Amino acid sequence: MTRSWRRTPAGPLLRCRVALVAAVSLGVVGVACAAPSALPPPLAGDYSHYSLPDGAEILPPTAVVPPLPPDPSSCGALSSLRPDPGLRPETAPPGSALAAIVARGRLIVGTDQNTNLFSFRDPSTGTLSGFDVDLAREIARDLFGDPDKVEFRLLTSAGRFDALERNDVDLVVHATSITCERATRVGFSSVYFEAFQRLLVPEGSGITSPADLAGKRVCTFIDTTSLATIQRVAPEATIVAVPDWDDCLTTLQLGQADAATTDNSILAGLAAQDPNLEIVGPNLELEPYGVVANKNNDALVRFVNGTLERMREDGTWNRLYDRWLGLLGPTAGPPAPSYRD
């Protein structure tokens, strides 16, 4: 039986709920602040009439959404290029993306600042932090001997592949699920994390599974695999599709959605900001994450896979998991890689 999960308030990542109507009227929702000594109460009153986040769409049960993608193992998308032990920065193939990065002297990585635990703006320092941020820094460490030689550019989930194809960034490290369709457009590293889609609900809501979502509003994200999954398992729910993961926290706090759904790793980051929320229900869909490069940038993908191999072997992956994702529970270790030549 799958047990529900909830986060107790701790640390600077906790986001306070805003209890004052005046604050809500100014659009100040989910404001970052120091951890309180007791659980903050849920918002009092009805704020469901407030405008939805910019770019949000309401999709009724009859809406046609992209179909659930096939299992990525069925098309070989989970098999990435084998690391080359002889591939080093100084031996990068001339004219390759890897050689251009080495010549530039820094790595440019696309991510976002709204995915708590993976890539977020630390309110105490103002710097980008999280599992994905540290992963990018490890790639820079292997490229230049210096984890600080990385430039982060902020992207939305919807714009990450376009930014890559415009060569605005060298890599995308942004909690990106590997799918068959995406693998025809971009190159993926080996799997560096496996998440499972679940539900995030207000504590005491009575929602414990997708069967409880009939007639309810469920927040999820535009252009993600989560949208197709929730329509399949909760066909009578209305979907609130938003462009930014943090928008689901806002819609839940204002009563504009009854539940949110996406990867449990991302939901845990939202729940860490509001202790009145809990993760419930069964695992709905496996979501394997990969680092993303432009299609045919083979040397760069092999180099990234070499970094991931090193992180598995020297314990770096486990240290990053314990630092950022330990609230998900004990880990069996990093996913085993699958390679092709």
Regions found by a protein language model. Name each.
Residues 53-92, 224, 291-329:
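Extended ligand-binding regions for polar small-molecule ligands
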Residues 175-184, 253-286:
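A ligand-binding cleft/hinge motif common to bilobed small-molecule-binding domains
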Residues 111-115, 154-158, 167-179, 203, ...:
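Beta->alpha turn/N-cap motifs
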Residues 108-111, 129, 210-224:
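Short loop->beta-strand "edge-of-pocket" segments that line small-molecule binding or catalytic clefts
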Residues 193-201, 268-305, 327-341:
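Periplasmic-binding protein-like
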Residues 137, 141, 148-212:
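Acidic, polar ligand-binding/catalytic clefts
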Residues 34-37:
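Bacterial signal peptide processing site
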Residues 47-172:
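Extracytoplasmic small-molecule ligand-binding "clamshell" domains
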